[in-house]
Amino acid sequence: MPVYNKEELVRFVEEAKQYARYGKVADYIPALGKANPNELSIAVYTADGKVVDAGDVTVKVTLQSISKILALALVLIDRGEDEVFRKVGMEPTGDPFNSIAKLEEVQPSKPLNPMINAGALAVTHMIRGRSVEERLERLLAFIRRLAGNEQITYSEEVAQSEFETAFLNRSLCYFLKQHGIIDEDVEELMDLYTKQCAVEMTCIDLARIGLVFALDGRDPHSGELLMPLDVARICKTFMVTCGMYNASGEFAIKIGIPAKSGVSGGILAAVPGRCGIGIFGPALDDKGNSLTGVKLLERLSKTYSLSIF
């Protein structure tokens, strides 16, 4: 296993920061529009339990679409593959993450995968519990175990900001309800989903969760199985095929690491058997991925031969 060097990581961060001027923050969500586009930080959590970081890793980042992979893991544990994949498919779309197009073209009208918004809404709908509060608490408890951090919660400001502006996601919910994919109150589902997306943590937390996936679901310190091997495998597969929105193919070729991004600028990556990586860089490219974060991962992948292909 390569020895990750802090001085080298700091240099890579400074190099990648030069690209921030070509990106822009997600200002269509007012609370995310306040982010500093020049911010960039990274944590690498290795299989032997060591952490190397660069940049301000104390800054908290909301998960946004990164939460989709965590909700999927919980729902797969709760309900099993057969039930989950009756409601949502397994295929990449090549469409933007918030597109409704394939829902209208494909029969039956179930979302093509859990990483696009329609599929993620169907997955969140399947989180067990009798109320929004109970379901959110179950998801938070699961995320806290993966991150080894009992303090993790969600940003009320970001959740409220997203709830007030989630017009397209509401449209997706009503479409899914019309076709029998979901059967709950749309506003309750939106309440849960926006709070799920607003769960916030540091790059170190992200990296530790990435390492759990990299270790096939095992806690890096205790060795306890936090999720079944098959669940970790399915999630990593989706990270490769759909994790970077409609740039997933290019990302697989250039970088080759299972990863999931969010429009907050966060990236969670899992290098099987080797390390987890957490990145925060809010300057986004036109696909909604962290522009500086992707540049940083590309440099890491090439320097340390991290591609799984």
UniProtKB/Swiss-Prot annotation:
Keywords, in A-Z order: Hydrolase
Record-linked Gene3D superfamilies: DD-peptidase/beta-lactamase superfamily
Catalytic activity from the UniProt record: L-glutamine + H2O = L-glutamate + NH4(+)
GO BP annotation list: glutamate biosynthetic process; glutamine catabolic process
Molecular function GO labels: glutaminase activity
Annotated EC: 3.5.1.2
Binding residue positions for substrate: 65, 117, 162, 169, 193, 245, 263
PANTHER family documented for this protein: GLUTAMINASE
Assembly behavior: Homotetramer.
Family to which this protein belongs: Belongs to the glutaminase family.
Protein name: Glutaminase
